[in-house]
């Protein structure tokens, strides 16, 4: 993965973003909650894709803060400027809030400006112990393989669900 340009991120981001020694992009909110963002290469055989990982390092409940999604979007936009690849995201199941996190994440990307440039889809999958989990994909609309990528995503998640026993 190509390194992200922090100057470009910080030119538009509400929160200052910096790179940690272990390669994670960090930012601290007005509520002193430290977040980490990193990207992990996926092993699928079809396309180059990265898992987008967003972690609340304080493990504290975060109040509604519009600066957080704005900062995350700046990071993701820079990811796509540097890497014409695919982002995958699995919502954390911590606290049983995965459905709410999936809706929130999609709202960020299906709203206003992002909808012009990205396609974001989320699907429910059957996880361990019959737990519902949510996986999302984000692809640039300009990607020449867009329809094929979305078809593979749908096929793979459908196949995954068919292989898992349902409650």
Language model segments and positions:
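Non-catalytic substrate-recognition and accessory regions of acyl/acetyltransferase enzymes
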Residues: 1-167
């Amino acid at each position: 993965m190509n390194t992200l340009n922090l100057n470009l991120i910080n030119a538009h981001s509400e929160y200052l973003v910096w790179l940690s020694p272990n390669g994670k992009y960090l930012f601290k909110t007005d509520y002193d909650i430290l977040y980490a963002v990193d990207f992990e290469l996926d092993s699928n055989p079809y396309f180059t894709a990265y898992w987008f990982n967003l972690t609340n390092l304080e493990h504290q409940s975060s109040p509604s803060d519009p600066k957080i999604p704005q900062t995350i979007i700046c990071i993701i936009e820079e990811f796509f400027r540097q890497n014409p690849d695919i982002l995958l995201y699995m919502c954390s199941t911590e606290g049983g809030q995965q459905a709410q996190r999936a809706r929130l994440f999609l709202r960020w990307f299906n709203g206003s400006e992002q909808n012009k440039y990205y396609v974001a889809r989320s699907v429910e999958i059957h996880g361990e112990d019959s737990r519902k989990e949510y996986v999302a994909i984000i692809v640039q609309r300009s990607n020449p393989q867009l329809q094929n990528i979305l078809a593979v995503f749908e096929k793979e998640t459908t196949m995954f669900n068919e292989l898992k026993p349902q409650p």
